[in-house]
């Protein structure tokens, strides 16, 4: 072997290793370069642009099909959804939303929440509730227990105190039956016809001494003079009636009557019948006039103020704040039971909506060839460095085989 030609034996392994090591980078660049088509004399130069830029749309479709066919399958998406929608995560999300809603209510300067709640209350009380009550009132047992309880615990036990009875007696004697009203009632009662009937009845039905007085004197003149006195002497009549009321202690008599007035003094049978009548009266009233009552009540109430007060109270209530976690947990459990049954159907419906394959295609198509080249080179350099090294080793081995073949061929 002529050692003067040593470079003939050494150069094949060295060149093979160098070529094998840099082949990947060269191949990647050849796939992408040039990025755009080159035209000479109006004709496109062959192999321009590079293979990937020229077929980028088809590459995007193939990448999308590969990912959706082997990586993001419906089963994998279901597993991903189950991991994402674990009960703890769902509960945390619901709790966050509830707290966010309460914070939004507190800072609602336009009172949008109050207007919404006001509309709900107005519809509930003014529209829905009257229709519901009208239907329920047809039942014989409608509000039976509630009305009986109110009757037994309130109406049956209702009794005026001494102060209340005194005030009511004063009002009765000063407003309902003052002396002037009594005087006018006497005048209206003592008509000529009434006086004649009283006089004749007194003459016919009396006996003994009263018969003598009735037939000799009669009551006609006396009653006529009384009526005339009430008409001519109004002030004097009122004074006499006031004195009579005081002498007869009518105020104290009325007070005692009112103070002792209670349903407990009535017979048991009467109380039971009164309770039944009360229940039927309430039921009949709700059937006939309940809708109008609630409608009038709805029109007279400022629902926005009520809704605002209600929301302020609820947003600052410690009970509401402490119950948010419980509510979120219950809602999360309900959602979990629903997903266990219908998750497969939901995922099947969500996949077309998300259009993941089209997103991948659009993303690959919108990426410039230079960015694709840089991404692939980064992957090769960081994750596939062994392939680069293996290319150099294979090039070295091929070069060694060439050297060995060259040596054996000379011998």
From Swiss-Prot:
It is found in: Cell inner membrane. It comes from the Bacteria. InterPro entries: DUF445, UCP032178. It is a multi-pass membrane protein. GO terms for cellular component: plasma membrane. Pfam families: DUF445. Keywords: Cell inner membrane, Cell membrane, Membrane, Transmembrane, Transmembrane helix. The chain crosses the membrane at residues 3-23, 387-407. Belongs to the UPF0754 family. This is UPF0754 membrane protein Ava_1421.
């Amino acid at each position: 072997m002529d050692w003067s030609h040593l470079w003939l034996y050494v150069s094949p392994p060295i060149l093979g290793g160098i070529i094998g090591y840099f082949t990947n980078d060269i191949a990647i660049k050849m796939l992408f370069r040039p990025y755009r088509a080159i035209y000479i004399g109006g004709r496109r130069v062959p192999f321009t642009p590079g293979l990937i830029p020229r077929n980028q749309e088809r590459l995007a479709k193939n990448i999308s099909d590969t990912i959706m066919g082997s990586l993001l399958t419906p089963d994998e998406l279901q597993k991903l959804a189950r991991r994402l929608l674990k009960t703890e995560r769902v509960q945390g999300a619901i709790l966050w939303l509830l707290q966010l809603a309460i914070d939004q209510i507190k800072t609602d300067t336009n009172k949008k929440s109050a207007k919404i709640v006001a509309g709900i209350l107005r519809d509930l009380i003014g529209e829905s509730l009257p229709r519901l009550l009208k239907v329920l009132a047809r039942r014989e047992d409608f509000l039976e227990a509630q009305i009986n309880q109110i009757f037994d615990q309130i109406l049956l036990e209702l009794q005026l105190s001494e102060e209340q009875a005194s005030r009511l007696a004063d009002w009765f004697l000063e407003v309902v039956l003052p002396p002037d009203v009594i005087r006018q009632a006497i005048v209206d009662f003592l008509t000529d016809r009434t006086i004649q009937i009283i006089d004749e009845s007194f003459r016919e039905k009396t006996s003994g001494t009263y018969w003598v007085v009735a037939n000799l004197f009669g009551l006609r003149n006396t009653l006529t003079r009384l009526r005339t006195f009430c008409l001519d002497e109004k002030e004097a009549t009122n004074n006499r009636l006031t004195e009579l009321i005081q002498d007869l202690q009518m105020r104290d008599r009325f007070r005692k009557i009112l103070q002792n007035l209670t349903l407990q003094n009535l017979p048991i049978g009467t109380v039971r019948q009164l309770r039944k009548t009360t229940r039927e009266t309430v039921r009949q009233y709700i059937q006939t006039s309940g809708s109008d009552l609630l409608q009038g009540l709805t029109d007279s109430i400022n629902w926005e103020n009520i809704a605002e007060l209600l929301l302020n109270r609820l947003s600052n209530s410690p009970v509401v704040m402490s119950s948010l976690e419980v509510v979120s947990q219950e809602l999360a459990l309900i959602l979990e039971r629903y997903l266990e049954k219908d998750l497969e159907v939901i995922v099947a419906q969500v996949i077309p909506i998300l259009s993941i394959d089209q997103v991948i295609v659009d993303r690959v198509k919108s990426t410039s060839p230079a960015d694709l080249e840089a991404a692939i080179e980064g992957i090769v350099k960081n994750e596939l460095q062994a392939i680069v090294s293996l290319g150099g080793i294979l090039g070295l081995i091929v070069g060694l085989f060439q050297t060995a073949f060259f040596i054996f061929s000379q011998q």
